[in-house]
């Protein structure tokens, strides 16, 4: 429901955003429910970019898939997780409950968001990593079988089979990632230092009212050196070469977390996003009027292109 509320800002009234396809209990056969957004949309004009990666799942994928299928905006990042199941809860006599999977979500063009249930289902993300999918677009496996090939409103080819494939691929940036960084980051030491530093310097930090003022001050505090000393006290040995390679990354995170502790999320995101290549790519697409965004309003013509979506979705039903 939250996804529908958000997407109502981007599409005209009555346009089908996604389909919930599944087997309904107490009924025989299959049932198809199209969910329609009611009420006037607020943002039918203007460019839209949706950011996704391998951790984007469920409602995020429904939103991204609908935006992509209607050619309403550009999807930027990496292939999404592939989670599109619907569960219904049944209360038992002893007050316990069972949740039964009854449906799957499909995008307007008919693509099934849920990844296939195979024996190695739980290893999917790991297999993507081993295959190099996070780092090179040509390493992404796409099943181009006719049954998994679909068309967007403007006739672009998109593929089903699980998850949403972005229009613009952005690889993971590992240029500043080192074993040292992974150790201090995964152990929570960056967060811990940021809290400790904020508490120790709260009287000074509270003087800064804007992100720019706070970031300018923190840039002069040699945070990386102070942090590595802190980490050494937590039994993480210094690795000079690795620290030098990861310095900018570490300092960016430290400044962002300190800003969050001081100014809240209004201070956190502007600093953190300076290292976000996916966001930068999306902004470039918007600023340069990427070709997909030249035709950015949902019209009756787009609606007509999907007038037979019910048949498409039923033909591709997987239960």
Q: Language-model segments: what does each one mean?
A:
Residues 11, 16-19, 31:
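Short linear motifs in low-complexity or flexible loops
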Residues 1, 22-186:
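Conserved acidic, small-residue-rich alpha-beta core segments centered on
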Residues 17, 22-25, 288:
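Local alpha-helix boundary/kink/capping signal
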Residues 112-113, 117-319:
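Conserved functional hotspot residues or short segments at active or partner-binding sites
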Residues 2-3, 7, 13, 34:
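Intrinsically disordered, low-complexity polyampholyte segments enriched for Lys and acidic residues
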């Amino acid at each position: 429901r939250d996804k529908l509320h958000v997407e109502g800002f981007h599409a005209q009234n009555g346009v089908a955003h996604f389909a919930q396809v599944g087997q309904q209990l107490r009924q025989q056969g299959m049932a198809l429910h199209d969910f329609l957004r009611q009420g006037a949309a607020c943002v039918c004009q203007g460019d839209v970019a949706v950011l996704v990666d391998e951790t984007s799942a469920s409602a995020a994928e429904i939103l991204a898939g609908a935006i992509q299928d209607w050619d309403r905006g550009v999807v930027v990042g990496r292939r999404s997780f592939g989670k599109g199941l619907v569960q219904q809860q049944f209360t038992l006599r002893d007050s316990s409950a069972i949740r039964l999977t009854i449906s799957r979500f499909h995008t307007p063009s008919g693509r099934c968001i849920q990844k296939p249930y195979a024996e190695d289902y739980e290893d999917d993300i790991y297999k993507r990593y081993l295959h190099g999918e996070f780092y090179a677009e040509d390493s992404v496996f796409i099943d181009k079988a006719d049954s998994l090939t679909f068309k967007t409103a403007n006739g672009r080819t998109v593929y089903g089979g699980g998850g949403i494939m972005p229009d613009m691929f952005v690889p993971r940036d590992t240029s500043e990632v080192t074993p040292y960084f992974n150790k201090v980051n995964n152990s929570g030491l960056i967060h811990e230092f940021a809290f400790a530093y904020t508490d120790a310097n709260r009287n000074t930090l509270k003087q800064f009212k804007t992100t720019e003022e706070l970031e300018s001050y923190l840039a002069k505090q040699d945070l990386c050196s102070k942090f590595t000393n802190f980490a050494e006290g937590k039994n993480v040995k210094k690795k000079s070469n690795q620290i030098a390679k990861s310095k900018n990354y570490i300092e960016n995170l430290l400044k962002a977390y300190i800003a969050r502790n001081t100014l809240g999320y209004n201070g956190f995101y502007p600093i953190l996003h300076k290292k976000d290549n996916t966001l930068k790519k999306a902004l470039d697409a918007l600023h340069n009027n990427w070709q997909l965004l030249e035709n950015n309003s949902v019209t009756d013509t787009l609606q007509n292109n999907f007038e037979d979506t019910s048949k498409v979705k039923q033909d591709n039903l997987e239960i």
